[in-house]
UniProtKB/Swiss-Prot annotation:
GO terms for biological process: gluconeogenesis; glyceraldehyde-3-phosphate biosynthetic process; glycerol catabolic process; glycolytic process. Keywords: Cytoplasm, Gluconeogenesis, Glycolysis, Isomerase. It comes from Streptomyces coelicolor (strain ATCC BAA-471 / A3(2) / M145). This is Triosephosphate isomerase. Substrate binds at residues 11-13, 179, 219, 240-241. Pfam families: TIM (PF00121). The gene is tpiA. PANTHER family: TRIOSEPHOSPHATE ISOMERASE. SUPFAM superfamilies: Triosephosphate isomerase (TIM).
Length: 258
C-alpha cells in the first residue's frame, strides 16, 4: 500500500494580520527546528493579505513549512471585484488552496459546481486543492452523512483527470463539529474517510485512492489528534482555531510523540 505522508494544515481563517503572521510562522519554525519533522508535512493557510509576508519569510529562511490560500477564484482575471486568481497565488508560490470550505458554502452559497470550477482553476495554475466536504447536523442525525459527503466529493472532482485527482487532498469536516467544541468521534470520522477512499476507487482506481491524503477537520486539538490519526484512512488534519496557538499546533503536528 502507498505510504501517505500526513498533512497537518492550519486554517487561520480571518485571523492574524501580516505582522502577526510573520511572528506566528517564526514561532512554528523555531519550535519544529529541534527535530526532523519530514515525517509530517506542515502547512498554513493564511489570509490573502498575509501571503506575501509568509512567502518572504519561508523563502528567506528556507523554512520547510508550506503555505497556501483559503480560497481561489474560478476565473483567471478580469472584472471580478474582490476575487483572487490562481495566477496571483501561483506567483506567490503557494502550494495549497482550500476549496469548498463549509464557511464558503454557507456564507457565499458555493455549490458543488462552483467548487468544481475552483478545483480545476487550482490545478490549471499548479496549486494543490484541499477539497473540503462534510455534512450539517441534520444530515448526520438523519443518517445520510456518508451519502451527502460522497456526493460533494463526486461533485468537486467532476471531469477531473486521474493525473490531477491523485494529488488532491480531501478534508472531511463535519460542519457541526467546526468551531463548536463538538468532536466527531474517531470511529465516525474513519467511517466517512474510508467511504471517501472507496468513492475515489470507484471514480478512478484503487491505486489512485491509496495515494490520496484524506484529512479530518473539526475541533482538532492536541488532546484528540493521536486517536484520530491512528485510524487507517485519516492522513492528517485541517486545524482551525487550534492552529492560531503555535504551541498547540506544534503538539498537533507531533501527534506521534503523545
Amino acid at each position: 500500500m502507498t505510504t501517505r505522508t500526513p498533512l497537518m494544515a492550519g486554517n487561520w481563517k480571518m485571523n492574524l494580520n501580516h505582522l502577526e503572521a510573520i511572528a506566528h510562522v517564526q514561532k512554528l519554525a523555531f519550535a519544529l527546528a529541534d527535530k526532523d519533522y519530514d515525517a509530517v508535512e506542515v502547512a498554513v493557510l493564511a489570509p490573502f493579505t498575509d501571503l506575501r509576508s509568509v512567502q518572504t519569510l519561508v523563502d528567506g529562511d528556507k523554512l520547510k513549512i508550506k503555505y497556501g490560500a483559503q480560497d481561489i477564484s474560478a476565473h483567471d482575471g478580469g472584472a471580478y471585484t474582490g476575487e483572487i486568481s490562481g495566477p496571483m497565488l501561483a506567483k506567490l508560490k503557494c502550494t495549497y488552496v482550500a476549496v469548498g470550505h463549509s464557511e464558503r458554502r454557507q456564507y457565499h452559497a458555493e455549490t458543488d459546481e462552483i467548487v468544481n470550477a475552483k478545483v480545476k482553476a487550482a490545478y490549471k495554475h499548479g496549486l494543490t486543492p484541499i477539497l473540503c466536504v462534510g455534512e450539517e447536523l441534520d444530515v448526520r442525525e438523519a443518517g445520510n452523512h456518508v451519502e451527502h459527503t460522497l456526493a460533494q466529493v463526486e461533485g468537486g472532482l467532476k471531469d477531473l483527470a486521474a493525473e490531477q485527482a491523485e494529488s488532491v487532498v480531501i478534508a472531511y469536516e463535519p460542519v457541526w463539529a467546526i468551531g463548536t467544541g463538538k468532536v466527531c468521534g474517531a470511529d465516525d470520522a474513519q467511517e466517512v474517510c474510508a467511504a471517501i477512499r472507496g468513492k475515489l476507487a470507484e471514480l478512478y482506481s484503487q491505486e489512485l485512492a491509496d495515494k490520496v491524503r484524506i484529512q479530518y477537520g473539526g475541533s482538532v486539538k492536541s488532546g484528540n489528534v493521536a486517536e484520530i490519526m491512528a485510524k487507517p484512512d485519516i492522513d492528517g488534519a485541517l486545524v482551525g482555531g487550534a492552529s492560531l496557538d503555535s504551541d498547540e499546533f506544534v503538539k498537533i503536528v507531533r501527534f506521534r510523540d503523545q
